[in-house]
Amino acid sequence: MQPESAMTPALEVTVLVSIGRHPLTGRVRRADQDARGVELARSLADAEVRLLHAGECNESSEAALRGYLGMGFSELALIEQPEGADVLPALAEALDATSPHLVITGERAERGEGSGLLPYLLAERLGWPLVSGLAAVESVEDGMATLLQALPRGQRRRLKIRLPAIVTVDDAAPTPRQSAYGPARRGTLESSAGEVCNDDEWATWQVQPARPRPKRLKIVKAASARDRFKAAAAKAEGTGGQVLTDVTPTQGAEAILTLLRDEEVLR
C-alpha cells in the first residue's frame, strides 16, 4: 500500500468555467478566458484539477461545456441553475464543501451581466484572498503560492499569497489548447442540484444589441519591439486639452464629462 501522502495530490485546483459567446457570430462556445484558466491549471505539477460550472444545461450549453472536456478531462461538475439565477450562493456552497487549495476563473463572463464581480463576491463570502490578472503560478509550497501577475505594458509582478485563494486570468494567461473531439464526447457532465437564488435586479434589466463603439483615443502603433519600447517610454505629447489646478470637485467632474462627450464616449 502506498503512503497516504503519495495518494493525496499536492494541490487541489477547481476551475470555474462558463458558457462563452463568439464575438462575431454570437454562437456559444467555451469562454476564452476560462479556457486559459483551464490551460493554466493543467500546467501545474502534482495538481488535481476539477472543472465546475453553475448554470442551465441544454443542447447548446452542453456543446460549449464539452469544449472544456476536450482539453483532457473525463468529467465536469455541473450545478444546475435556471436561466437568470444568481449562481453565487450555489458556487460558494460547492467550494466550501470541497475546499480546494486554488480556484481559477476568467476575469468576466462573455454572456449575461458580465460585470466581472463574481470572483470578488466569492472571495468575500469565503474569506479567501484574490489575485486578478494572473499570468503564471511559479510554485506552491507549505500552503503558500508564488504567483506572477500581469500588469500593463507587458510588466509582471511577483506575489505570494496564502492558500486557499481565488485567482482570475485574462489574455496574459497561456493560450488554451484546441479541444479534441473524442475526449469531449466521451467525457461526462456530473449534474447536481444546488441552491437556487433568483437575481431580482438582473430580471429588471433590459438587454439589447450594443451600439457601435465610440471613437477611440489615439493609439501609437509600432512595427518593431524597439519602436514599441520607445513609444512606451516616451512622454505623452499634449495635443490639446487643459490642465486644471485649484478647481473644485464639481468643476473637475464637469471637465471630465465634457471630454467624454467630445470623444463620443458619452452621448
UniProtKB/Swiss-Prot annotation:
Disruption phenotype: Deletion mutant loses its ability to grow using DMG as the sole nitrogen source but is still capable of utilizing sarcosine and glycine as the sole nitrogen source. Keywords: Electron transport, Transport. InterPro entries: ETF_a/b_N, ETF_b, Rossmann-like_a/b/a_fold. The keyword Transport applies. It holds the Pfam family ETF. The keyword Nucleotide-binding does not apply. One of its GO terms (molecular function) is electron transfer activity. It comes from the Bacteria. SMART domains: ETF. Disulfide bonds: none annotated. Participates in the electron transfer process during N,N-dimethylglycine (DMG) degradation to sarcosine. Heterodimer of an alpha and a beta subunit. Belongs to the ETF beta-subunit/FixA family. This is Electron transfer flavoprotein subunit beta. It comes from Chromohalobacter salexigens (strain ATCC BAA-138 / DSM 3043 / CIP 106854 / NCIMB 13768 / 1H11).
